[in-house]
């Protein structure tokens, strides 16, 4: 029976008679200890095979090769006659990785760090590298300024040679910056330079961007900010010589010292443009033109390069190369720019494709395209298509990608990748005010009906004072040229008295249609025709109301003994011709971050109507991004309206302008801003209502003129994950507005009753507050809390409002 011998030991004691000078011929190879690793995989990693002559060098190489696979903790090679026996001890497999104590860093980031070290579930765990794993994670924390963090890896054995790897973190506190020193600055003070940093040694309470917690990445960003600051002001030789970061003994404080060389300011002496400009040299040279003697500016140079690339991109040169070299003359402190341009190949579009539109039909997206298939690639046209898709409001995100066609030197495919959002909604509106209590609204809206791009909606309100219903539909592409067609039918039964408005009941129904005509990429005109029937009953003697009735030829009686005798009933059938202009270049349809939207609309009664008047409204919004990410946005909105009678008739009081509420001036109850009703209180001695005394009230009656303005600072929602940034929006706002009646007559009777002059537009109401909008899976939710800052007698506050709905 053959004796197994440890080959390494045997070789040390070898003799030619046992192994031979050239080793032995391997007739078989056996493995002992394999569990997870397949025999075939182990054999492939070995340098020797059956039939080979094994030498001591081969055996050593075999051991090293098996260790190199990372699958084994121990390897031994034995000889059993002419057979090689390989004894191994496999490393355990990581069954799970868990974390404990990590509050400052998310698990996803820690897993990415481990993955970079080759530590992941399903892989073998090398126990000898545990300390390296711990140190790698600690270094990761150090880069975030948490120098007192410790990491302990706990390995728990499991059946079948598996282990659970648990990483326990003791984070401690973040190291705070005690002082930032800049050495070598002469043209600018240290405070002036540090004021542009994210990292600060002192952070005022109002600065929501500054941070005293040290982070390596933020320091790198601040260094780039410092470099750009100097380069943009002519310091072409500026250099950051060294950066020193010192840690206090308790690891809680950081001292940062930046050593810089400012150099002198340099001026531009001119530009030289050369290279392949694809026949657009005149346009490129115009973009590269500078004024000799102006200060060198690094930001302008970068913009110049980007402008040249964009110019060439509009002509189909998708991948141009533009590089700028500086010729610095230290003697006269000037810089000449040498701009090298290589337009490259001109590309044509083979296909325009869409991905991610599972509901919306391709034709709906394709009709928004300005880049045509078969034409040369125009980067501006591709961008216009992206903007138009965003503006539809059907998608959470829209991304574009230009893919080169394999085997073609001059063809590309343009791919629009969209992520659809829920465009249908069933909304229940809830409002709560200190005086109004709770009210409800209901609505169904589908902005992308069956993926056709058509809008279909039904809305209704049912409460103690109103029953309202409206059915509407709009086809934005009624014709292939983009002419839109819309229509609606509505019914409204309204008791103004129960709504704390002027006393009357209104039953109204009507139908209307609108045609819209695009006149440019962002401008459109629309024309409409509407029919409206109004029945007014239970009208009580009120100055504005009676003045209107008198203008249309109705002279209500003045009788005080019977309330019913003082009522007046009135019906009107009106036909309106409406006209409007609109402009829209917002970057997306919902939650915009840049651009403007404006509209000017008007309507006028046509012959055959019982009323004769016109009404004009203007509404404009503008968004200014304050950060590249679009998280910080300044929004301003202005609205104005005016109406006046024709042919000696007054504007119907029931079609007045109103303000107050969630869509106008938040913090005030809906429709309560502006003129209030003044009721006649006649007695038996009065024969004309104009002779009657009047009483003031808090019932809103509206006015024929309106002006409203809002300013909002849109900001990141605190404690919210970045992935929800496109569905949640928080803002601080200030609203202001007023409604007035230009035909109001401030008589002795109204003055005696203490009624203010309602023709004065200066009675402006102001409120401020905070708002949150959320496109939640359960539906759109809007929350606002506002406090009136400036109010007048009779105004009614409503601080808290929210809407909640269901989307599909």
UniProtKB/Swiss-Prot annotation:
Residues 1-20 form the signal peptide. Residues 24-91, 92-172, 175-263, 266-344, 347-421 form the POTRA domain. GO terms for biological process: Gram-negative-bacterium-type cell outer membrane assembly; protein insertion into membrane. InterPro entries: Bac_surfAg_D15, BamA/TamA_POTRA, D15-like, OM_assembly_BamA, POTRA. It comes from the Bacteria. Transmembrane segments: none annotated. It is found in: Cell outer membrane. The keyword Membrane applies. Part of the Bam complex, which is composed of the outer membrane protein BamA, and four lipoproteins BamB, BamC, BamD and BamE. Part of the outer membrane protein assembly complex, which is involved in assembly and insertion of beta-barrel proteins into the outer membrane. Constitutes, with BamD, the core component of the assembly machinery. Belongs to the BamA family. This is Outer membrane protein assembly factor BamA. It comes from Sodalis glossinidius (strain morsitans). The lineage of its organism: Bacteria, Pseudomonadati, Pseudomonadota, Gammaproteobacteria, Enterobacterales. The gene is bamA.
